[in-house]
Amino acid sequence: MAKLILATFAVVFLALAATSLAGDPDMLQDVCVADYKSLRGPLRLNGIPCKRLENVTANDFFFDGLTNAGNTTNAVGSLVTAASVERLPGLNTMGVSMARIDYAPWGLSPPHTHPRATEIMFVAEGTLDVGFVTTANKLFTRTVSKGEVFVFPRGLVHFQRNSGNTSALAIAAFNSQLPGTQSIADTLFGAAPPLPSDTLARAFQVDGGMVESIKSKFPPKY
């Protein structure tokens, strides 16, 4: 656990060092702890309104959700535990967040994007095959081992796969309080309302029956 904590601090330091290129607007006050109660009303804005300073406590800046391994018993064999503004209100306006990613043996983080942030990933345990694809369809990929770091540029499709017979663990940092995640398969085949099957069939050059079969594996998430 001590090694994990040190690794976490290292990743956060690297993320903070890049705040001049943060994906979020600059903050205009010392702190702006997210006031979740305000989200119940009709007001919506690019961020979350601040809690009154007299109501802010140290717990608003604390999160222990990364201490335990995530349950990787699922179809892809991985689980992301995010420490974003949705779980850590003190991150509001800070322009950073992080996540813990647990991988079962041969587990996969399927191709996805973070539309609002660059990701820097530190491998704490195991070995991962990782990569991203540029807008020119060029793939950059390599194997990343324990103690090594890899960067995924903002908005580009990328993946990670555990290439070993044992569990793996990675810690990721983002230059946004809420980087967002779009899984390519979920987005295309599990949208609500669904994308037209003939559109997907023509895009992937397959028949409609195959599209419907794939859609059945990705129920819409509302």
From Swiss-Prot:
Belongs to the germin family. It comes from Oryza sativa subsp. japonica (Rice). It is found in: Secreted, Extracellular space, Apoplast. SMART domains: Cupin_1. Mn(2+) binds at H112, H114, E119, H158. Pfam families: Cupin_1 (PF00190). May play a role in plant defense. Probably has no oxalate oxidase activity even if the active site is conserved. Residues 64-212 form the Cupin type-1 domain. Disulfide bonds join C32-C50. GO terms for cellular component: apoplast; plasmodesma. InterPro entries: Cupin_1, Germin, Germin_Mn-BS, RmlC-like_jellyroll, RmlC_Cupin_sf. Gene3D superfamilies: Jelly Rolls. It comes from the Eukaryota. Glycans are attached at N55, N71, N165. The keyword Metal-binding applies. Oligomer (believed to be a pentamer but probably hexamer). The keyword Protein biosynthesis does not apply. GO terms for biological process: plasmodesmata-mediated intercellular transport; regulation of root development. Keywords: Apoplast, Disulfide bond, Glycoprotein, Manganese, Metal-binding, Secreted, Signal. Its main location: secreted. This is Putative germin-like protein 3-2.
